[in-house]
Design a protein with these regions (language model features):
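A glycine- and Lys/Arg-enriched "phosphate-lid" helix/loop adjacent to the NTP-binding pocket
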Residues: 102-180
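NTP-dependent small-molecule kinase module
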Residues: 23, 148-225
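Hydrophobic anchor at the beta1->P-loop junction of P-loop NTPases
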Residues: 7
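Pre-Walker A (Motif I) flank of P-loop NTPase domains
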Residues: 1-4
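Conserved lysine of the Walker
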Residues: 15
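P-loop (Walker A) phosphate-binding loop of NTP-binding proteins
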Residues: 10
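ATP-dependent small-molecule kinase phosphotransfer cores
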Residues: 31-126, 130-132
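Hydrophobic positions on the alpha1 helix immediately C-terminal to the Walker A/P-loop
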Residues: 18
Length: 225
């Protein structure tokens, strides 16, 4: 099997940017990575995810329980694996993914009491990696961002238009719980944590993409060598 490396973090943490920069830098070093991302909005397999995020099943993330929501995302990943990148993985290719099963761990744990997190994670990984047959990641890069900074970045993405946010992005309490769940998962599962928040003139802000990427590449070069 090939290598599967995941970029994980809250909304607005720069996962897509860092995954893309990592692919560019890895190309320059002689690797041939395939970049994938989830949800796969260009595929019909993401239909239930779109319905969930647009509020068709309820206007709050908690209106769909952790197990049901997880299956929406898992089926999307299964379809992507079977149609797009499974062969690359089986032929020892290098896959760089913006989100993965790890996102279910973060965003669905946040719907449950902390005492139930371990049981949920056990179910989730058994379901996706064993029952569905998806490959487990070889490494996870967790981009840690202060929730307030994350919210500002999301607002900038939509130019202040709140109507463009999905039900998760609109729910600040849910995002705070997701941050707590992400930190727990990072510790428990051995993710490589990169702190992306810094303070400039007394205000919390995100580090530059290039600054974060230098730390990302130092880690990737170590695990790929």
């Amino acid at each position: 099997m090939g290598k599967l490396i995941i970029f994980e973090g809250l909304d607005g943490s720069g996962k897509g940017t860092q995954a893309e920069l990592a692919c560019q830098n890895l190309h320059s070093k002689g690797y041939d990575p395939l970049k994938i991302s989830f949800p796969d909005y260009d595929s019909p397999s993401s239909a239930l995810v779109k319905m969930y995020l647009s509020g068709e099943f309820g206007q709050r993330p908690d209106d769909v329980n952790a197990y049901a929501a997880s299956t929406f995302y898992a089926v999307d990943r299964f379809a992507s694996y079977k149609t797009r990148w499974g062969n690359v993985s089986r032929q020892n290719g290098l896959i760089i993914s913006d989100r993965y099963t790890t996102s279910n761990a973060v965003h669905q744990c946040s719907k449950l009491p902390p005492m139930h997190w371990d049981g949920f994670l056990e179910w989730l990984f058994e379901f996706e990696y064993k029952k569905l047959g998806l490959p487990a990641p070889d490494a996870v890069v967790y981009l840690a961002v202060d929730p307030d900074v994350s919210q500002r970045l999301i607002a900038q993405r939509y130019h202040g238009d709140e109507s463009k946010k999905d039900i998760q992005e609109r729910d600040t309490e849910y995002l705070a719980r997701s941050r707590a769940a992400a930190e727990y998962c990072a510790r428990k599962l051995g993710w490589h944590r990169i702190e992306c928040t810094t303070t400039v003139d007394g205000q919390k802000t995100i580090r530059t993409p290039e600054d974060i990427q230098s730390e990302v590449m130092a880690y990737l070069e170590r695990i790929l060598s």
